[in-house]
A protein has these predicted regions:
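Hydrophobic, aromatic-enriched alpha-helical segments typical of multi-pass transmembrane helices
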Residues: 1-202
Length: 202
């Protein structure tokens, strides 16, 4: 059973994840651009810290969702919570690596550019394994989400899953990068976190 204080914290986590996710997408898509690669000296530290905080906020949302949705006797929900929480922890750690290498006191064989590219291309895998949790939350949270919430949650979950698999298969068209990032990252995912915040407030 979730307490009133936990619901309040969960709502704050959802708002934090929404704000940071939107800021990250706006910086990476519209400030740096889709052709940017490597570590950016100006935006790198900001992106790293913002990404880490975003994943931490997401971990809070995911962790408390088990109590919010009463995941007892819901094995797929419980499993998706564990998976999403674990890969989000990976996201927290890797987000800070490029800045740590760039500001290292000694020379390393791994450069900040290499680390930034590594983080950029592991992030789709992280979101791929968070996708099942989105789908499960949409399923079991339909009674406490806004009326439009389950549809958005399923679109985010299945959309990210399909797009990521297409990308990993090497079939992702370059021309679709910005439109899909705008739809999934700037519109639907923040809307989904807003819906989740409403579920915690219900």
């Amino acid at each position: 059973m979730i307490t009133a204080e936990e619901k309040k914290i969960g709502r704050r986590f959802a708002h934090g994840a929404l704000t940071l996710l939107l800021a990250n997408f706006l910086i990476q898509v519209f400030v740096l651009g889709p052709d940017a690669s490597g570590y950016n000296e100006t935006w790198g530290p900001i992106i790293g810290i913002s990404n880490a905080l975003q994943f931490m906020a997401g971990m809070g949302v995911v962790r408390l969702s088990g109590k919010l949705l009463d995941d007892k006797d819901k094995p797929l929900l419980t499993g998706s919570i564990g998976l999403a929480y674990t890969v989000s922890a990976v996201g927290v750690v890797t987000a800070l690596v490029p800045s740590a290498i760039y500001n290292a006191f000694n020379e390393t064989s791994l450069t900040a550019d290499m680390a930034a590219d590594f983080v950029f291309y592991t992030t789709p895998a992280v979101f791929l394994f968070i996708a099942p949790w989105n789908i499960q939350f949409a399923k079991y949270g339909k009674d406490i989400l806004p009326s439009w919430g389950p549809a958005v949650g399923n679109t985010v979950g299945y959309g990210i899953g399909i797009v990521t698999l297409v990308f990993l298969a090497g079939l992702f068209p370059d021309a679709a990068f910005i439109p899909l990032n705008v739809i999934l990252g700037v519109v639907l995912t923040p809307a989904w976190f807003f819906a989740i915040s409403k579920a915690y407030a219900s």
